[in-house]
Amino acid sequence: MKALYPGSFDPLTLGHLDLIKRGCSLFGEVVIAVLENPTKSPTFSLESRIAQIKDATKEIRGVEVCSFKGLTVEFAKRKNADLILRGLRAMSDFEYELQIAHTNRTLNQNYETVFLATEAHFSFLSSSVVKEVAAFGGEINHMVPERVATELQQKFK
């Protein structure tokens, strides 16, 4: 099976990476679909985010990294994905993700969204938290892959 894991990944966290590994273990293949959203101002360019993810996942079998814009279900169809993979940290994530999953099912009945609960030690982790800690000079090596930590620290010098 092939899972599509969409997101902005700005930046990739160890929580994302854990979900990717577990997704590959469960489904065999995970397409990491990095959202290209012209209405947002990301910390890292699309190219940087893709390079960071490729670097962090180079040892994981079954990973493909690519960008997309538009509807997730349309991209899932183009990539011949069987399902959409999402992670849940808290009930607040569930409420939002459930709305998106229902919307995706309304748009295309062929796609189920599979939710994986985040490992407890990553439940506090979000890209926003990582950026805020980095901006104030805090330690982020336990939150993100090494390359991401280095690039974030350089960005917030």
Swiss-Prot record:
What sort of enzyme, by top EC class, is this?
A: transferase
Q: Gene3D superfamilies, from UniProt?
A: HUPs
Q: Which cofactor is recorded for it?
A: Mg(2+)
Q: In which pathway does it act?
A: Cofactor biosynthesis; coenzyme A biosynthesis; CoA from (R)-pantothenate: step 4/5
- The residues the record assigns to binding substrate are 8, 40, 72, 86
Keywords from the named record: ATP-binding, Coenzyme A biosynthesis, Cytoplasm, Magnesium, Nucleotide-binding, Nucleotidyltransferase, Transferase
Could you cite one Gene Ontology molecular function of this protein? ATP binding
Which residues are ATP-binding?
Answer: 8-9, 16, 87-89, 97, 122-128
InterPro entries assigned: Cyt_trans-like, PPAT, Rossmann-like_a/b/a_fold
Q: Where in the cell is it found?
A: Cytoplasm
Q: Where is this site: Transition state stabilizer?
A: 16
Q: What is its EC number?
A: 2.7.7.3
Which reaction(s) are listed as its catalytic activity?
A: (R)-4'-phosphopantetheine + ATP + H(+) = 3'-dephospho-CoA + diphosphate
- Going by the entry's taxonomy, the superkingdom of the source organism is recorded as Bacteria
What PANTHER family does this protein's entry cite? PHOSPHOPANTETHEINE ADENYLYLTRANSFERASE (PTHR21342:SF1)
Q: Assembly state and interactors?
A: Homohexamer.
Q: Which family does it belong to?
A: Belongs to the bacterial CoaD family.
Q: Which HAMAP family match?
A: PPAT_bact (MF_00151)
Q: Tell me, what does this protein do in biology?
A: Reversibly transfers an adenylyl group from ATP to 4'-phosphopantetheine, yielding dephospho-CoA (dPCoA) and pyrophosphate.
The molecule here is called Phosphopantetheine adenylyltransferase
Question: Which species does this protein come from?
Answer: Prochlorococcus marinus (strain MIT 9211)
